[in-house]
Amino acid sequence: MEKLGMNEIREKFLSFFESKGHLRLPSFSLVPKNDKSLLLINSGMAPLKPYFTGKETPPSRRVTTCQRCIRTPDIERVGKTARHATFFEMLGNFSFGDYFKKEAIPWAWEFVAEVLKLPVDRLWVTIYEEDDEAFEIWNKIVGLPPERIVRMGKEDNFWEIGTGPCGPCSEIYFDRGEEKGCGKPDCGIGCDDCDRYVEFWNLVFTQFNKDEQGNYHRLPNPNIDTGMGLERIAAIMQGVDTIFDVDVIRGIRDFISDLAEVEYGKDADKDVSIRVITDHIRGITFMISDGILPSNEGRGYVLRRLLRRAARHGKLLGLNDAFLYKVVDSVVENYGGAYPEIIERKDYIKKIIKLEEERFKETVDQGLAILQDYINELKAQGKTVLEGAKAFKLYDTYGFPLDLTKEILQESGITIDEEGYKEELEKQRVRARSSRKEDNSLWEQDIYSTLGDISTKFVGYEVYESEAKVLAIVKDNEVVEQAEAGDDVSIILDVTPFYAESGGQVGDSGVIEEEDTLIKVNDCKKVGNKFIHIGTVERGLISVGDKVVAKIDVSKRKGAARNHTATHLLHKALKEVLGDHVNQSGSLVAYDRLRFDFSHYQAVSKEELKKIEERVNEKIYEQLPVVVEEKNYEDALKEGAVALFTEKYGDKVRVVKIDDYSMELCGGTHVKNTSEIGIFKIVSESAVGAGLRRIEALTGIEAIKYLNEQKEILDRVSETLKAQEKEVVSKIENLQQSLKDKEREIEGLKTKIASILAETLIDSAISVDGVKVIASRVEDYDMEALKTLGDILKDRLKSAAVILASSSKDKALFVGMATKDAVEKGVNMGAVIKETCSIAEGNGGGRAEMAQGTGKNISKVKEALEKAIEIVKGQLKA
């Protein structure tokens, strides 16, 4: 058996299936397209679901891919086992209603036995217990002995997700030899006690459709979906025990060892840390390359978790400063040949990682300060267990790993309520699941899938109206033969000039007419190859088979075309001004406005926005020709066309070229010359998520309307201030300065009043164990004023515990403060204010030195303050 490298195996697999008539597709982005059920692509099949369900037409009925994937459910086991990883590559061959078991099984055997040359006497297969067809093919056609074909139950060898397409599967195993076994007499396929038999290729035969009653119906055109883990087959081919010893991954592992000056294999704990970093940095690199940025939600949170976990393990190796960004060089060196995009984006990836590492270092320092407060509180209370909720807050808010919290607490003889921590963690998982709408619509049959193979020919690139035939009518989610005036309908035509919503561009509106019939079309969408014209029958009767004329609203189409070409100019200008790391992550192209979302790690400055706007307008005034061509996908990319990572492309693509300035793959409608755009005006720039920015802009007459509105506002402001336009800003600045001066005067007076009031309150203080205790209500003070008064009292009394209350907008306000020596004697204002606020039907808390809170019941303030004195007395006498 030849020791093939990962890159060699990947290429051999893809080339083999190309020789069997498969179209090789590049790996899809880790960001799922139009699939809310997935946070990240986690299998080779995941990005191909629309093809399996008929929602979209595949570029070929036979496809082969090597798909990069991310899975994190077992993240805590990564580094501790031989095979667990969050990032992996999945080799696959797929058939969309073309070939089936008779081809898939022999081809799989041919590849493993003849191309990879695995020893056939060490290969085993499993099949679904009722799949006699698969048994016959393995036994009679392939020639595998019956004793090496293992029948297994539904749990192991039948693939299904709820309702929809499903079917049996067959898995191929490699026997690593008796020395890897557990030695038990019944050791075999599926043994839980050893890793002797390794499954490396799963062939799924999607031949049934499961209905809601649990019945299985044979699909007229069954599919093939296979998946082989590249790292796993590489480990087998290279005769190594873990994926971290495989050639490509080992290169990254050794780079980390050298960086940390730690020899791998000498220290079990350090080896775990090296493996964790080796795994995580691969996923981190590809996630950022695919446009994901660290955040506190969704896939951004997954990325942040991987980054911080890897950084934490670096700390355990003595790498205290930012280092992960350096490891990207090794990832690019080892994976760049297969994924050239990470070579292009290397500098951007490193910049994002370094920024996040530096931010994490800051939050770790903040977390340490808060943890020390928790330790002081526990010692003051004589407790030795930290609440799980507090440990979780350190993890969730400050990215503080649980093991680091444990380690620091142990030094003070304190442990963590781990059950409480797990409860908080589970609550967060529940919140995350509920916030992400489960959407299995890709697997569900909709009304349009019942219409068979009818399709619509789109002619809207060439004409604004066309004759057509009505193929289907849908009303109230039911297929009908006809509709009449007043009915809301969805109509499918055989030919249409209506652009269907896609690529961010809104669908066309217009009318469908025949002699006495008029349908007002408000929108057009696409399901598979069917264009759905959504609207209302204004007059007459429309029936299936009718000959009609479809006309779009030309003025709206031209508006959308202006805005779509403008987004291409904007995309290019953003890259020129901000950097090549900018990638489009979403857009809206309407007839009256445009919106463009893009990856960038900070707000765009006013100066940068000005440059971007000027650059776009320069290209408009240069009157650049806009040319649309159809090209081969690979050729278009070689010529420099920009492809969006969230889109799927077929072999033939539509290329929109704006002279020599911009070239993008795009299916939208465009102007023929940039001069038709007229003018481009940015109206806003904002954040839409971590690392994602949004620009909204106007073109043409809409931009002129906007500028006129701004001029009217400026005129009104000028008139109000009694100043000329050029003097407006300085006049406002003078007014602002005057206002600040008055506010300072007011604050000074408040401080003087507080100082006078403090003398009165000091007279009311009681002394407990040498500490002056004050609990008093003052009227018309907000929270900040209460804190100021509390600081004055602390300064004057030197040794004090102060609880102050006031009211604001129908709620009670409480502030508690204690001097350092009072805290050392046992005073804990966090506990005092928490109980005080609860009496006033509210919530509060904080640190031992300072706490605050509110209450809903103002009438309970007196009772709450009396209770506060009791609590402080108890703390001091404890």
Curated annotation (Swiss-Prot):
Catalytic reactions on record: tRNA(Ala) + L-alanine + ATP = L-alanyl-tRNA(Ala) + AMP + diphosphate
Location of this chain's protein in the cell: Cytoplasm
Disulfide bond annotation, renumbered to this chain: none
Cited Gene3D superfamilies: 2.40.30.130, 3.10.310.40, 3.30.54.20, 6.10.250.550, Bira Bifunctional Protein, Domain 2 (3.30.930.10), Threonyl-trna Synthetase, Chain A, domain 2 (3.30.980.10)
Gene Ontology MF terms in the entry: alanine-tRNA ligase activity; aminoacyl-tRNA deacylase activity; ATP binding; catalytic activity, acting on a protein; transferase activity; tRNA binding; zinc ion binding
Biological processes annotated in GO: alanyl-tRNA aminoacylation
Record-linked PROSITE patterns: AA_TRNA_LIGASE_II_ALA
Cofactor info, note text: Binds 1 zinc ion per subunit.
PANTHER family per record: ALANINE--TRNA LIGASE, CYTOPLASMIC, ALANYL-TRNA SYNTHETASE
Family: Belongs to the class-II aminoacyl-tRNA synthetase family.
Job of this protein: Catalyzes the attachment of alanine to tRNA(Ala) in a two-step reaction: alanine is first activated by ATP to form Ala-AMP and then transferred to the acceptor end of tRNA(Ala). Also edits incorrectly charged Ser-tRNA(Ala) and Gly-tRNA(Ala) via its editing domain.
NCBIfam families xrefs: alaS (TIGR00344)
Entry protein name: Alanine--tRNA ligase
